[in-house]
Amino acid sequence: MKTSLFKSLYFQVLTAIAIGILLGHFYPEIGEQMKPLGDGFVKLIKMIIAPVIFCTVVTGIAGMESMKAVGRTGAVALLYFEIVSTIALIIGLIIVNVVQPGAGMNVDPATLDAKAVAVYADQAKDQGIVAFIMDVIPASVIGAFASGNILQVLLFAVLFGFALHRLGSKGQLIFNVIESFSQVIFGIINMIMRLAPIGAFGAMAFTIGKYGVGTLVQLGQLIICFYITCILFVVLVLGSIAKATGFSIFKFIRYIREELLIVLGTSSSESALPRMLDKMEKLGCRKSVVGLVIPTGYSFNLDGTSIYLTMAAVFIAQATNSQMDIVHQITLLIVLLLSSKGAAGVTGSGFIVLAATLSAVGHLPVAGLALILGIDRFMSEARALTNLVGNGVATIVVAKWVKELDHKKLDDVLNNRAPDGKTHELSS
């Protein structure tokens, strides 16, 4: 029993995070030097994200009997994303208004160091709607894979899958090659995941070493408020959706606990994307649904980021005594409904979108970003964890809506009654 515990990725990552926190706290200079370990692990993951998405989507779409099913899945997924993301934005807006973590700070925006956030503000200038849509279209196929842009790779994979499906039996050889290549890629993922404890240790040691526990205490009210909001969202909102779909949110969280710990250590939900594709398929969701919903969700279904954006924007308004009446808050909500769709599931993207939002709204000081720059790294953990759970739940819900969910397999796996790989008849 003890041997199996020590060998489990869950235990190893949890232990690595704890050691990283201790090292960063007691030896901050050494902790900061551990940054390459975390960065290296995330880069290894990003290295295989593009081929994983390509193989999963192509084989999923090409293997479907009807192309109408693909269109239906995409439409249902986008509808779900929009509804749940809007709920997340509204919840964040309500709670930050009730708790008011920034009230009484009386910060003069003129005294803030605008240089500290200049790089984010500059990046935010390119976050327009048209720019976002145009960025989905790659300049070249090779460029899409080289940059690792999820939506660009997804677009090419969908087109490739459609074209391969139309070839029929003539494309069977290509289909078999891609499916075999997919197995090789997942073999690489298994090797990379053995390094997850090292990556989590390095990332956590760097975070605590660089920013210190003092940063947490200084703006602790906002951090606590945000974490509690994310927990409530997962338990109440996603929990209710899960219950209505026929499964327990707590059993699902237990099922993806290793992925959650990896995300906790790296602060990026993208680091668990390859394993989530595999795990959601083993949970009973058809491959074509998983291949479409998970990658798309990384740009359109970021529940944790949505909560963060409304809370952070209103917090800055409260701290700087900027006017924020009901009209301004509705305007903020409308802007965020659009700008939040450009936030990929990578560390720092939420901060860039926040800068873009403050610029678009107009009456909020962009320099106010300096207030939360130091604690953004600590808040990114809750963002990433909520995003991951949200995308997992979305996949199951969409799979059920389009009748591509194996209910018995879902129930068996979550209740530990069957091996992950066992198959059952699809139920509608």
Swiss-Prot record:
Signal peptide limits: none
GO biological processes: DNA damage response; fumarate transport; L-aspartate transmembrane transport
Membrane topology term: Multi-pass membrane protein
Keywords, in A-Z order: Cell inner membrane, Cell membrane, Membrane, Symport, Transmembrane, Transmembrane helix, Transport
Stated induction or repression of this protein's expression: Subject to CRP-mediated catabolite repression. Repressed in the absence of oxygen, induced in the stationary phase and approximately 2-fold by citrate and C4-dicarboxylates.
InterPro entries in UniProt: C4_dicarb_transport, Na-dicarboxylate_symporter, Na-dicarboxylate_symporter_CS, Na:dicarbo_symporter_sf
Record's keyword annotation contains Transport: yes
Coiled-coil ranges (or none): none
Molecular function GO labels: fumarate transmembrane transporter activity; L-aspartate transmembrane transporter activity; malate:proton symporter activity; succinate transmembrane transporter activity
Transmembrane segments: 5-27, 47-64, 77-99, 141-163, 184-206, 219-241, 326-348, 352-374
Domain of life: Bacteria
Gene Ontology CC terms: membrane; plasma membrane
Location in or out of the cell: Cell inner membrane
UniProt note: phenotype after gene disruption: Cells lacking this gene are only able to grow after a 2-day lag period on D-malate as sole carbon source.
Similarity comment text for this entry: Belongs to the dicarboxylate/amino acid:cation symporter (DAACS) (TC 2.A.23) family.
PANTHER family (UniProt xref): AEROBIC C4-DICARBOXYLATE TRANSPORT PROTEIN (PTHR42865:SF1), PROTON/GLUTAMATE-ASPARTATE SYMPORTER (PTHR42865)
General function of this protein: Responsible for the aerobic transport of the dicarboxylates fumarate, L- and D-malate and to a lesser extent succinate, from the periplasm across the inner membrane.
Protein name: Aerobic C4-dicarboxylate transport protein
Organism encoding this protein: Escherichia coli (strain K12)
